[in-house]
From Swiss-Prot:
The lineage of its organism: Eukaryota, Metazoa, Chordata, Craniata, Vertebrata. Pfam families: RNase_T. Induction: Up-regulated by p53/TP53 in response to ionizing radiation and DNA-damaging agents such as adriamycin. Phosphorylation of p53/TP53 at 'Ser-15' is required for effective induction. Changing D114A: Abolishes exonuclease activity. This is Apoptosis-enhancing nuclease. Residues 85-105, 281-325 are annotated as: Disordered. It comes from Homo sapiens (Human). Gene3D superfamilies: Ribonuclease H-like superfamily/Ribonuclease H (3.30.420.10).
Length: 325
């Protein structure tokens, strides 16, 4: 009996059951890895371009020196162990960088901020955020928006803030602006003049070790006339150190101009400032309370408060004193 041939459909099933060629598998894996490597290299190049990743040394060149205040991984681990041991005792842990070294923030990790406020509440005495500007290390504007306060505006303080009713027509609600601004500030070194006022308006507390308040710029200089007052206004610092006039005219302050000026002042003393930070930082606990002693003083020096508010506050103080008597 002659055996019948298997149907073609059955014959076609055989090739599909064969094991794939090993070379094909390796080739596919190689292609997949090549794509991953290309994406990795593209990401690496982008980070290097943005300054978030240091460039590798060229072949044959000597390794780059360790930045001032920056410890190697071994040194960091060793100091961390010492800190943990010290934590079991009564004395607070203190780490000091090796002498002769310093570290400063990368330009991409440094921004300057300035806020303008309007008056809300009774007689417009409550300050609320109405405009916020953030500039980069090189002075490029990263954020500049008008912001609608949570309470009705009683006094626009246009002469000082530059804010008018028209600016509020397309203003961003405070809650929305706050999220946008904090996203830009977190993880950054923040520069500004009388920064506590800006953070208070934002209802935000930034780590003290990551703030650079330009009211302290005179401490790093020996310019005559800058130490006559406890705190010098941004306007005076700009004139004496940068030889530029700001906050002039009848249109009020410009938060972009003020933030840019603050960054210029910081860069003027950046080396000295970061050297001091490297010496005084690295204590446990790390952060100190923000200095709020300059709140009212700084606003008055920059002619922020309207005259009628100043008179009103004096009148209220007299009334309170009369009631006590």
């Amino acid at each position: 009996m002659v055996p019948r041939e298997a149907p073609e459909s059955a014959q076609c099933l055989c090739p599909s059951l064969t094991i794939p060629n090993a070379k094909d598998v390796l080739r596919k894996r190689h292609k997949r890895r090549s794509r991953q490597h290309q994406r990795f290299m593209a990401r690496k190049a982008l980070l290097q371009e943005q300054g978030l990743l240091s460039m590798p040394p060229e072949p044959g060149s000597s390794p780059l020196p360790t930045p001032f205040g920056a410890a190697t991984a071994t040194e960091a681990a060793s100091s961390g162990k010492q800190c943990l041991r010290a934590g079991s005792g009564s004395a607070p842990c203190s780490r000091r960088p090796a002498p002769g070294k310093a570290s400063g923030p990368l330009p991409s990790k440094c921004v300057a901020i300035d806020c303008e406020m309007v008056g809300t509440g009774p007689r417009g005495r409550v300050s609320e955020l109405a405009r916020c500007s953030i500039v980069s290390y090189h002075g490029n504007v990263l954020y500049d928006k008008y912001i609608r306060p949570e309470m009705p505006i009683a006094d626009y303080r246009t002469r000082w803030s530059g804010i008018t009713r028209q600016h509020m027509r397309k203003a961003v609600p405070f809650q929305v602006a706050q999220k946008e601004i904090l996203k830009l500030l977190k993880g950054k070194v923040v520069v500004g003049h009388a920064l506590h006022n800006d953070f208070q308006a934002l209802k935000y507390v930034h780590p003290r070790s990551q703030t650079r308040d330009t009211t302290y710029v005179p401490n790093f200089l020996s310019e005559p006339g800058l130490h006559t007052r406890a705190r010098v206004s941004l306007k005076d610092l700009a004139l004496q150190l940068l030889h530029k006039k700001i906050q002039v005219g009848q249109h009020g302050h410009s938060s972009v101009e003020d933030a840019t000026t603050a960054m210029e002042l910081y860069r003027l003393v950046e080396v000295q400032w970061e050297q001091q930070e490297a010496r005084s930082l690295w204590t446990c606990p790390e952060d100190r309370e923000p200095d709020s002693s300059t709140d009212m003083e700084q606003y008055m020096e920059d002619q922020y408060w309207p005259d009628d508010l100043a008179h009103g506050s004096r009148g209220g103080a007299r009334e309170a004193q009369d009631r006590r008597n």
